[in-house]
């Protein structure tokens, strides 16, 4: 017999919600949560669906945060089975979103239903927040909802994000923060000319090389708590016409910083602009701020999560701030303590994405235990 969480996960996977599409996932979830007594509010913006569902009232406010969108699967022929036709083989569920993160979303729903059935008059507020704009631009999703919450004065005390955080077994890692992310697109201007007459041209590659070398060599910090040191990586670089006898007129450089709480986007931007100015470059520089770092220090949420995950996994979890960004970066500035707890992440964004059925079926109890420890 198929378990409730497995069936719901399959129903969600079958809805091909490639970002920013939701494909009916949130309507299905809202129907279930409404039937369980949750008040559901749809906060759609443009092509993005956002769902805010609450049960109870007052403080403390505990939010289960997730996303219903998925990354594109690529050619279906590369998959062993249709990425949007979920299939269980040898105790493993395959399909796009199985691990990232429709399994966690389904487990949130089942855990929330079970919790309010057992504790209909529970203290505080249990909330579920879902978006279809996590894997894409992340502008009209939780970023937008967080702005609405700030305007409303919506308090959030604790936030559990269901991102796939585990590495080898369910519960072996507890995400307690994330680095900030800042991207820059730099264009260094020169003067195009013939390579035989360099005195009549200005080579932007040569002009920029010392500045780029300084950026790459810089030790930005030594890390922070469990954060690795801030890192700057050049991701793309382009210049030239394709001909080997033409000095290019401009150099294009794309770079990204993943940074610790020692910094914020504004201070990093100032540092880099000052460096470029010292090298007397003629340039333009466009920034994209993906999110500031966040960190949950030792406290109730972190202690409870460590104890619950340790009981489930059989050993205390590693407490980490690694990985990319998540939507928790938009909730943390509201004053919330944020953690991330979810299934094994080995196959996310890959062909034949999958999750162990045993892990999936354990997730609702894991989330329900966290909710009970925090609210009851």
Curated annotation (Swiss-Prot):
Cysteine-cysteine disulfides: none
CDD domains: M20_DapE_proteobac (cd03891)
Keywords for the protein's UniProt record, in alphabetical order: Amino-acid biosynthesis, Cobalt, Diaminopimelate biosynthesis, Hydrolase, Lysine biosynthesis, Metal-binding, Zinc
Entry EC no(s): 3.5.1.18
Signal peptide: none
Enzyme class: hydrolase
Annotated residues for binding of Zn(2+) 2: 100, 135, 349
Needed cofactors: Zn(2+); Co(2+)
Record note on quaternary structure: Homodimer.
Protein name per UniProt: Succinyl-diaminopimelate desuccinylase
Organism in which the protein naturally occurs: Xanthomonas campestris pv. campestris (strain B100)
Gene name, Swiss-Prot/TrEMBL: dapE
